[in-house]
Amino acid sequence: SRAAPPPGRMERHGGGMSPLVVIDYAHTPDALEKVLVAMRPAVADGRELVCVFGCGGDRDPGKRPVMGRVAARLADRVVVTTDNPRFEDPAAIAGAVAKGIVETGQRRWLLELDRAAAIAAAVHAAKPGDVVVVAGKGHETYQEVAGERRPFSDARVVDEALAGRSPA
């Protein structure tokens, strides 16, 4: 038997009559590429791989457009959102990510700075057979904003969004 991955690493939610949502801590270009490549075979024929992610503030700004390019190249749709903006402007962080997406010519992307709304929108728009990867925070139970740790759980938001989906 296979051991379950640790919380926040390839953590699966939904599937079956709902889209499969995978939460992963991937927060570097290499890690994001690996999780998207790993999940591509799970996408049903004719369905889509969706990537929801953001980049942390007060961290390497050079990786932001690179991560945008990785997501745009490997996912069918991309939703750019916040991660832990810390003391940086969330819109500026997302703008740097978006620059990388735009450079690829990918047109199927959107920007939603409210992480819960971004995750919910991606889950609600997804169909059975789609795979939604929610990357960047994984097991974290908070979001760091302006020196404050606010309670936040990707898993809770994903489960609430899946529970609130209309039947396919």
Role assignments for model-derived ranges:
Residues S1-A168:
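ATP-dependent carboxylate-amine ligase
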